Design a protein with these regions (language model features):
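C-terminal or mid-to-C-terminal helical accessory/interaction module adjacent to the motor/catalytic core
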Residues: 106-190
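Phosphate/diphosphate-binding loops
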Residues: 80, 88-103, 107-114
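Phosphate-handling DNA/RNA-contact segment within nucleic-acid enzymes
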Residues: 1-76, 80, 93-94
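Acidic, metal-coordinating catalytic cores used for nucleic-acid/nucleotide bond scission
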Residues: 44, 65, 85-94, 114-120
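Active-site-proximal structural scaffolding
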Residues: 20, 42, 66, 90, ...
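Flexible glycine/proline-rich, aromatic-decorated loop/lid segments
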Residues: 70-73, 99-101, 140-144
Length: 190
């Protein structure tokens, strides 16, 4: 019952996981057509999504996202939407990917799985429960910086001086790393 859905292929000399994107050859035309790519964690998430005609979905093939992944995707669209699992590992992976997105010069946004669908922990589970909620979730991503701010507001008690100070310190570090001066100015004024 606690077995994984699948076991990831290990990295080898012939198979470089940091450069390969699962499902990209099947998704690239749809990514161009829709104007955005959806990146998920698992291969099953990609397969389930393609089976319900949401075909602009790819996966990082069981490895952490890299700048190489983002640069490869940016050949088809600069709008990249992340939908990693809703567990702590997925949240951590999303946070790491946001800084990589800034390095790669892509526009990242975050898809949060609609929790009204019986606590689906990944896209595959959500698709099995409610295909329309999956489509709706993809259509309503949250800008990456806003997602990060929301995460830290949940973790820190911003009703206290220490919580506000910690949040401000984290937020300023994130904003300082932004490349776009308009975006940087917007968040500084927030």
């Amino acid at each position: 019952p606690n077995a994984p859905k699948y076991l990831n292929t290990p990295q080898t000399l012939l198979y470089d996981k940091s450069s390969n994107i699962f499902g990209l050859s099947q998704a690239k035309n749809e990514i161009r057509k829709t104007g955005f790519a959806v990146v998920v964690e698992g291969n099953m998430d990609v397969i389930s999504s393609h089976q319900v005609d949401v075909r602009n979905v790819v996966a990082t093939a069981g490895t952490a996202m890299t700048v190489n992944h983002l640069k490869a995707l940016s050949r088809f669209s600069n709008d990249i939407r992340l939908c990693f699992d809703s567990d702590q590992a997925g949240i951590n992976a999303t946070e790491r990917a946001i800084s990589l997105g800034q390095q790669a010069g892509v526009e990242l946004s975050i898809i949060t799985l609609d929790q009204s669908a019986g606590q689906a922990k990944d896209p595959d589970e959500l698709i099995q429960k409610d295909i329309e909620l999956w489509r709706k979730s993809i259509s309503n991503p949250q800008p990456a910086m806003e997602w990060v701010f929301d995460q830290y507001q949940k973790r820190l008690d911003i009703s206290t001086a220490k919580g506000k100070k910690d949040f401000s310190t984290i937020a300023l570090k994130l904003v300082e790393n932004l490349n776009d001066p308009v975006e940087k100015d917007f968040y500084i004024n927030e």
